[in-house]
């Protein structure tokens, strides 16, 4: 396993070069690499006390930077210019490697973000879906084209009637109020009357979702104060409500 050592928050020389390019607001695709040579060498000076094996990669890049800068400062004669054209440009090679490193670093950052986001996502476990045999039935038996047309028009008319083009409320909406205390008293009386009372039975008697929610909260409160207990044989099975006896309440601890 390869050991990656961070030196003052930089993972290798290319990471340092990218930092200097960003710090000096330079374009990586159009840069004179010698512009950041001085700053790079200042950083190398601060690594004198570090292990040579750790700083060797930094020193290799530093020598390349000095080579590039020295070639720019020294005068060129015609023979050297022709030789330079035929040889590979060290500055171009370094920039190509730096651009490639930047691409991999961006991809690594993206994958890290996806990994961290994945810890907050929970997927549903796969189920075994039984294949149902398709019944070969002709649903259009004794149905005429005219009857289909009339049915289509009826559906379109109902759909248009539901659309509120004026963006106004045609009638006042009355707020249905349900109190938890009232539902608690109602549940206690129902449990006394019916010893085998299920929550689904209570829910069916509710007129809306809001009443179901208030009824459920009332049930939780009755359980908390040890007046009612619920019995369920297994997950997703029916929930039955029973009155709690005094001796049972003394044995429970919350």
UniProtKB/Swiss-Prot annotation:
<keyword id="KW-0131">Cell cycle</keyword>
<keyword id="KW-0963">Cytoplasm</keyword>
<dbReference type="Pfam" id="PF02616">
    <property type="entry name" value="SMC_ScpA"/>
</dbReference>
<dbReference type="InterPro" id="IPR003768">
    <property type="entry name" value="ScpA"/>
</dbReference>
<comment type="function">
    <text>Participates in chromosomal partition during cell division. May act via the formation of a condensin-like complex containing Smc and ScpB that pull DNA away from mid-cell into both cell halves.</text>
</comment>
<dbReference type="GO" id="GO:0051301">
    <property type="term" value="P:cell division"/>
</dbReference>
<comment type="subunit">
    <text>Component of a cohesin-like complex composed of ScpA, ScpB and the Smc homodimer, in which ScpA and ScpB bind to the head domain of Smc. The presence of the three proteins is required for the association of the complex with DNA.</text>
</comment>
<dbReference type="GO" id="GO:0005737">
    <property type="term" value="C:cytoplasm"/>
</dbReference>
<dbReference type="InterPro" id="IPR023093">
    <property type="entry name" value="ScpA-like_C"/>
</dbReference>
<dbReference type="GO" id="GO:0007059">
    <property type="term" value="P:chromosome segregation"/>
</dbReference>
<protein>
    <recommendedName>
        <fullName>Segregation and condensation protein A</fullName>
    </recommendedName>
</protein>
<comment type="similarity">
    <text>Belongs to the ScpA family.</text>
</comment>
<keyword id="KW-0132">Cell division</keyword>
<dbReference type="GO" id="GO:0006260">
    <property type="term" value="P:DNA replication"/>
</dbReference>
<keyword id="KW-0159">Chromosome partition</keyword>
